[in-house]
Amino acid sequence: MHPQQLVVSWFSLVLLASPIVAIWELEKNVYIVELDWYPDAPGETVVLTCDTPEEDGITWTSDQSSEVLGSGKTLTIQVKEFGDAGQYTCHKGGEALSRSLLLLHKKEDGIWSTDILKDQKEPKAKSFLKCEAKDYSGHFTCWWLTAISTDLKFSVKSSRGSSDPRGVTCGAASLSAEKVSVDHREYNKYTVECQEGSTCPAAEESLLIEVVVEAVHKLKYENYTSSFFIRDIIKPDPPKNLQLRPLKNSRQVEVSWEYPDTWSTPHSYFSLTFCVQVQGKNKREKKLFMDQTSAKVTCHKDANVRVQARDRYYSSFWSEWASVSCS
């Protein structure tokens, strides 16, 4: 490639269609074409422009076809289906000047496609993302499920309110080692850790946190959104250091525990309430609810005492159980 070609070897796209049509840049040289998806849909006209001072000798190719698609500084294509998406390249003198990738975002009957992630249907239908926080520090974890294993890419972004300057930082999505089984089918689980940039744990929340997961599978683009207050996704870790102490002249024992290390402090302000239950092989005793960190229970041989926690003043999720053996 000649030096003068390097200076201006970049690629631009112009969409020639009605005002409601959208084409936008997902990342450098990756563009999303939004399509209404129905039989005999006309598709969208996209004009690709290769920016170079030369007027002649430019050809166009696509990774979807081995043929030369056209010549000249521009190439007009009609994008109707996935066969029209993919990577387009403009060439001159045997050298590639630039490449750009077109991905499709489908809309059927006014609804964007949600084919990549599994609907977990809890706490309501169309719940593709689940998020939890162990405390009020502004740190939270989100996860999602998919049956797809290959040609898959995720990116995550988050913010609190549309104009909040602090923002929320999310790391890269990671694939969990273990599969998740739902309705006799196995799914891959992806998780991401997020942290609010500046937070006051004791402050009343007025703006929702929004998490957006962008998913690309082959040439398909989709996005998924979840909005929440931290207080609505709180799930404490289980109580720690469960211990049993026999009581003199009694068939009962005293079970005691401590707040989890991950819970917000001071505990006098960020208080937990607890649920205690004796679980035998064949039955479970009545649950006891209390604010203190000990209780008296009848502990039968071969039974377990288990304890879980949740926010005392706001109906958070219950933690997982912590347990200790009676034997």
Swiss-Prot record:
<keyword id="KW-0964">Secreted</keyword>
<dbReference type="InterPro" id="IPR013783">
    <property type="entry name" value="Ig-like_fold"/>
</dbReference>
<dbReference type="InterPro" id="IPR050676">
    <property type="entry name" value="IL-12"/>
</dbReference>
<dbReference type="Pfam" id="PF10420">
    <property type="entry name" value="IL12p40_C"/>
</dbReference>
<dbReference type="InterPro" id="IPR019482">
    <property type="entry name" value="IL-12_beta_cen-dom"/>
</dbReference>
<dbReference type="GO" id="GO:0005125">
    <property type="term" value="F:cytokine activity"/>
</dbReference>
<dbReference type="InterPro" id="IPR003530">
    <property type="entry name" value="Hematopoietin_rcpt_L_F3_CS"/>
</dbReference>
<dbReference type="InterPro" id="IPR015528">
    <property type="entry name" value="IL-12_beta"/>
</dbReference>
<dbReference type="InterPro" id="IPR036116">
    <property type="entry name" value="FN3_sf"/>
</dbReference>
<feature type="disulfide bond">
    <location>
        <begin position="50"/>
        <end position="90"/>
    </location>
</feature>
<feature type="domain" description="Fibronectin type-III">
    <location>
        <begin position="238"/>
        <end position="327"/>
    </location>
</feature>
<feature type="domain" description="Ig-like C2-type">
    <location>
        <begin position="23"/>
        <end position="106"/>
    </location>
</feature>
<protein>
    <recommendedName>
        <fullName>Interleukin-12 subunit beta</fullName>
    </recommendedName>
</protein>
<dbReference type="InterPro" id="IPR003961">
    <property type="entry name" value="FN3_dom"/>
</dbReference>
<dbReference type="InterPro" id="IPR036179">
    <property type="entry name" value="Ig-like_dom_sf"/>
</dbReference>
<keyword id="KW-0202">Cytokine</keyword>
<keyword id="KW-0325">Glycoprotein</keyword>
<keyword id="KW-1015">Disulfide bond</keyword>
<dbReference type="GO" id="GO:0005615">
    <property type="term" value="C:extracellular space"/>
</dbReference>
<dbReference type="GO" id="GO:0004896">
    <property type="term" value="F:cytokine receptor activity"/>
</dbReference>
<dbReference type="GO" id="GO:0016020">
    <property type="term" value="C:membrane"/>
</dbReference>
<comment type="subunit">
    <text>Heterodimer with IL12A; disulfide-linked. The heterodimer is known as interleukin IL-12. Heterodimer with IL23A; disulfide-linked. The heterodimer is known as interleukin IL-23. Also secreted as a monomer. Interacts with NBR1; this interaction promotes IL-12 secretion.</text>
</comment>
<keyword id="KW-0393">Immunoglobulin domain</keyword>
<comment type="function">
    <text>Cytokine that can act as a growth factor for activated T and NK cells, enhance the lytic activity of NK/lymphokine-activated killer cells, and stimulate the production of IFN-gamma by resting PBMC.</text>
</comment>
<feature type="glycosylation site" description="N-linked (GlcNAc...) asparagine">
    <location>
        <position position="223"/>
    </location>
</feature>
<dbReference type="InterPro" id="IPR003598">
    <property type="entry name" value="Ig_sub2"/>
</dbReference>
<comment type="similarity">
    <text>Belongs to the IL-12B family.</text>
</comment>
<dbReference type="InterPro" id="IPR007110">
    <property type="entry name" value="Ig-like_dom"/>
</dbReference>
<feature type="signal peptide">
    <location>
        <begin position="1"/>
        <end position="22"/>
    </location>
</feature>
<keyword id="KW-0732">Signal</keyword>
